[in-house]
């Protein structure tokens, strides 16, 4: 008895996907509008597991979307706005062609617009979800805020991104939320902890832009359109959590200090934004909260739980100390250093910062202030040093933040070769190569003084070089003596055995030396034997996986040893060069 004939590609995975062209026709949108809608709604293409089945036997390259995603887009109200905008462009073009200027003005006044608020709420049901997805939004907004006012993107978008990023930086300063900073080739990486969520973003350096031609700025502008809406909501909620005014306002005392020099910098319409962007003044609060230290209740607990709580308490104390790293210090920035990045970092850790009044609005004190403790310079020998303050290069600020302590300033004086700038985002595991600079930093964090390590190493190298010849001779003599003694013992033992064999006597028990058992070595041997037996009892798949893991560990150890050898060779070359310079006649 025959069944119904089954047709190909009418069930299974072939019915779960749809090509981009079919989806676009279903929505009645052009390709740029379809792409824009997918970006705003967070709909992305999918790669089917069986592409040939989905493509109905064809092997042509096509982009596929899930049908349920396209059905989800059918009910989006923005689709109608896109259609209205298409009609608006057609009418506007016709009015321009007929030179009907009244109609042109009327159409521009009634230009269709839309909001993305409902999409933000739809994509991020909770505030924590929005914070977890804030990395890309911040990076894109910081990038657009540095763009010049060219035809690549709208001026309003650049100004909006600048305002939102300045607002977020002010929140980080007020909440003391900054944790890590790293200078890279791409830009400056920041990590802030906002409501327990780590947020990492990158801010480009303040260089002139050379716009590449192979970048689609329309796609970037669409992402930025969504990200600015998201960041606006996030900033509003974050400011509410700290009882700060939103839009942000500068405190009345700082406002009065800046009022004296306001007219010389900008117009009234621009001065408030310039003052906010200076990052040198605190923000006004709705209600100033009373600072009370909340003490945790103590309950009788087990020993293990108590140890965990003690570790947690120490971690919180270290974090609070890190937040007040620059508290009580006054910095002055020279005009050649990156002002905004340094001001943001110093203010995030409780320090006071200022600069020359002719450089930017927002300077709070002059370079002649007697309370200045550190002056950040990047050009040696440009000014007369003032007693009572340290002159350091900008890297000192970044390294102090990552080290979580105030580093010695001797290695950061103007004109001095700077130490390597280590990344705080790298955490070494067991078996990894740890550079000597990181070991020195770890020693400083433990409270040790690694200042004389290099001198001791150099002295040891010098002593080793002086006694190198004598040591080689002594080692050779010792080896000859040991070899001679071992040969004599073997000859005596062999001759005794030969005499017993020839005499026909039974082998006698010979007196030996008592050997003490090494318990630690026996325990290691038992452990290695148990491990070997456990490996023998493994299944084939488990043994293969174990061998892969051990191979990876051995490879990591080999790479670490190779790096250590390279570093040792480099240090030896540098030491020999220094030694040659010392011994060279003047």
UniProtKB/Swiss-Prot annotation:
Cross-link (Glycyl lysine isopeptide (Lys-Gly) (interchain with G-Cter in SUMO2)): 515
Keywords: Acetylation, Chromosome, Isopeptide bond, Nucleus, Ribosome biogenesis, rRNA processing, Ubl conjugation
GO biological process, one term: maturation of LSU-rRNA from tricistronic rRNA transcript (SSU-rRNA, 5.8S rRNA, LSU-rRNA)
Post-translational modification: Sumoylated.
Basic and acidic residues: bias regions: 562-577
Gene3D superfamilies in UniProt: BRCT domain
Similarity section: Belongs to the pescadillo family.
Name of this protein: Pescadillo homolog
């Amino acid at each position: 008895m025959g069944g119904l004939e089954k047709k190909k590609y009418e069930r299974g995975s072939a019915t779960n996907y749809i090509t981009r062209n079919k989806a676009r026709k279903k929505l009645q949108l052009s390709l740029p509008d379809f792409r824009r809608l997918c970006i705003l709604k967070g709909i992305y293409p999918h790669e089917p597991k069986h592409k040939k089945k989905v493509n109905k036997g064809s092997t042509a390259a096509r982009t596929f979307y899930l049908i349920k995603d396209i059905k989800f887009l059918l009910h989006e109200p923005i689709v109608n706005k896109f259609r209205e905008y298409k009609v608006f462009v057609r009418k506007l073009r016709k009015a321009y062609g007929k030179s009907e200027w009244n109609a042109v003005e009327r159409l521009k006044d009634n230009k269709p617009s839309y909001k993305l608020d409902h999409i933000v709420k739809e994509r991020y049901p909770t505030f924590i979800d929005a914070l977890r997805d804030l990395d890309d939004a911040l990076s894109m907004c910081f990038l657009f805020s540095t763009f010049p006012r060219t035809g690549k993107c709208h001026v309003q978008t650049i100004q909006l991104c600048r305002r939102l990023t300045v607002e977020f930086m002010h929140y980080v300063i007020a909440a003391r939320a900054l944790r890590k900073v790293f200078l890279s080739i791409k830009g400056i990486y920041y990590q802030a902890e906002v409501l327990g969520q780590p947020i990492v973003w990158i801010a480009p350096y303040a260089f002139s832009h050379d716009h590449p031609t192979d970048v689609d700025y329309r796609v970037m502008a669409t992402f930025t359109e969504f990200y600015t809406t998201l960041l606006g909501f996030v900033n509003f909620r974050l400011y509410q959590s700290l009882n700060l005014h939103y839009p942000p306002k500068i405190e009345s005392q700082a406002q009065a200090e800046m009022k004296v020099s306001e007219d010389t910098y900008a117009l009234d319409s621009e001065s408030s934004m310039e003052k906010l962007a200076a990052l040198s003044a605190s923000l006004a609060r709705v209600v100033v909260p009373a600072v009370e230290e909340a003490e945790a209740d103590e309950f009788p607990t087990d020993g293990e739980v108590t140890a965990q709580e003690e570790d947690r308490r120490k971690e919180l104390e270290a974090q609070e100390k890190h937040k007040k790293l620059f508290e009580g210090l006054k910095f002055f920035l020279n005009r050649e250093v990156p002002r905004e990045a340094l001001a943001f970092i110093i203010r995030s850790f409780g320090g006071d910062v200022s600069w020359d009044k002719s450089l930017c609005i927002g300077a709070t004190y002059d370079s002649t202030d007697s309370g200045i403790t550190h002056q950040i310079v990047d050009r040696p020998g440009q000014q007369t040093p003032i007693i009572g303050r340290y002159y350091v290069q900008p890297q000192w600020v970044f390294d102090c933040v990552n080290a979580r302590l105030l580093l010695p300033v001797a290695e950061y004086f103007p004109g001095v070769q700077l130490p390597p700038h280590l990344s705080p985002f790298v955490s070494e595991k067991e078996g990894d190569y740890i550079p000597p600079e990181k070991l020195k930093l770890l020693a400083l964090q433990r409270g040790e003084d690694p200042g004389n390590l290099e001198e001791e190493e150099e002295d040891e190298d010098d002593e080793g070089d002086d006694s190198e010849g004598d040591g080689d001779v002594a080692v050779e003599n010792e080896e000859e003596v040991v070899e001679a003694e071992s040969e004599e013992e073997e000859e005596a033992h062999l001759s005794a055995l030969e005499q017993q064999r020839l005499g026909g006597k039974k082998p006698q028990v010979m007196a030996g030396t008592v050997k003490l058992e090494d318990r630690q070595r026996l325990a290691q041997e038992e452990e290695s034997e148990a491990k070997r037996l456990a490996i023998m009892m493994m299944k084939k798949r488990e043994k293969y996986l174990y061998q892969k893991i051990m191979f990876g560990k051995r490879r990591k150890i080999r790479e670490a040893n190779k790096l250590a050898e390279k570093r040792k060779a480099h240090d030896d070359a540098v030491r020999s060069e220094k030694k040659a310079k010392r011994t060279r006649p003047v």
